[in-house]
Amino acid sequence: MARYTGPATRKSRRLRVDLVGGDMAFERRPYPPGQAGRARIKESEYLLQLQEKQKARFTYGVLEKQFRRYYAEANRLPGKTGDNLVILLESRLDNVVYRAGLARTRRQARQLVSHGHFTVNGKKINVPSYRVSQYDIIDVREKSQKMIWFEEAQENLLDAVVPAWLQVVPSTLRILVHQLPERAQIDVPLQEQLIVELYSK
C-alpha cells in the first residue's frame, strides 16, 4: 500500500482530527466530507478501533506494514503496549525535526530528512523513520544551513516552544534529545488502547 500523498485536510475531516496541525480548512469544516458530513452514523466498536489506527498512521505518515512492525515491537517491550507504540512513533527522526520547529508539518520534516539535510551524532541520516535515542545530537548539515528555509526557521526558533524532552539551540540549529518522551508528554489526540484492542483480536 502506497503512502497517502493527497490533500491532508480530506483525511483530517474523515478521521475528525487535525492531522497536520493548524489546518484552517479543517477547523472551518471539522466533519467528514459528503452530505455536509454533519450526520454522525452509529459507529461500531471495530470501526472506532480502525479509525484510531488510521489516525495514528496518517498523523505520523506510516504505511500499514510499517505500522504493524511498530505495534509488534511495542508489544514486546515492557510496559503498556499502547504507550510504547506512541513513544516509538514519536521517536522517529522526522517527527523530532517537526517537534523541534525545523519544519511546519511532519510531511515537510519527512522530505527534509529524506533529502539528507540532517546528521545524527555527526553521521548523515536520510531515513525519516530513524529512531532517535536519549542524548542524540541532531544537526542541520553545514551546507544546508544556507538554505532560505533553514534561515527562516532559525529566526522562528527564537520564539518556538518545544517539548520538554528536547532542546533546540537556534544559533546552530542543533537539536538535543535529553530523554525519550513519556506518554504524558505527547500531545497527540490518540486513544491508543483502541489500537491495542484492534490488534489483539
Curated annotation (Swiss-Prot):
SUPFAM superfamilies: Alpha-L RNA-binding motif (SSF55174). GO terms for biological process: ribosomal small subunit biogenesis; translation. It comes from the Bacteria. Keywords: Ribonucleoprotein, Ribosomal protein, RNA-binding, rRNA-binding. InterPro entries: Ribosomal_uS4, Ribosomal_uS4_bac-type, Ribosomal_uS4_CS, Ribosomal_uS4_N, S4_RNA-bd, S4_RNA-bd_sf. GO terms for cellular component: small ribosomal subunit. Pfam families: Ribosomal_S4 (PF00163), S4 (PF01479). GO terms for molecular function: rRNA binding; structural constituent of ribosome. Residues 91-151 form the S4 RNA-binding domain. Disulfide bonds: none annotated. Part of the 30S ribosomal subunit. Contacts protein S5. The interaction surface between S4 and S5 is involved in control of translational fidelity. Belongs to the universal ribosomal protein uS4 family. One of the primary rRNA binding proteins, it binds directly to 16S rRNA where it nucleates assembly of the body of the 30S subunit. With S5 and S12 plays an important role in translational accuracy. This is Small ribosomal subunit protein uS4. It comes from Corynebacterium diphtheriae (strain ATCC 700971 / NCTC 13129 / Biotype gravis). The gene is rpsD.
